[in-house]
Amino acid sequence: MKLTHVLIVAVLVLTVCHLTMAVCKSGGQACWFLLKKHNCCSGYCIVAVCAG
């Protein structure tokens, strides 16, 4: 059960990361709200969103 939960969480994190990158590339609004930064499409910001 624990391994299954870990896999589910990993998939969710990757999905959120992918969606966040898509939003950042299209307009950048989501990342600005999350991190209060304007340069939301930089690699650092994407990593921070994925990790956060």
Curated annotation (Swiss-Prot):
Keywords annotated in UniProt? Disulfide bond, Knottin, Neurotoxin, Secreted, Signal, Toxin
Q: Does the keyword Transit peptide apply?
A: no
| Organism annotation | Californiconus californicus (California cone)
Question: Predominant location of this chain?
Answer: secreted
Query: Could you identify this protein by its name?
Result: Conotoxin Cal6.25
Superkingdom of this protein's organism? Eukaryota
Output the Gene Ontology cellular-component terms. extracellular region
Cysteines engaged in disulfide bonds, as pairs = C24-C41, C31-C45, C40-C50
Say if the entry is tagged with keyword Metal-binding: no
Domains (record comment): The cysteine framework is VI/VII (C-C-CC-C-C).
UniProt tissue specificity: Expressed by the venom duct.
Compartments it resides in: Secreted
GO molecular-function terms, A-Z: toxin activity
Function (record text):
Probable neurotoxin.
* Signal peptide segment: 1-22
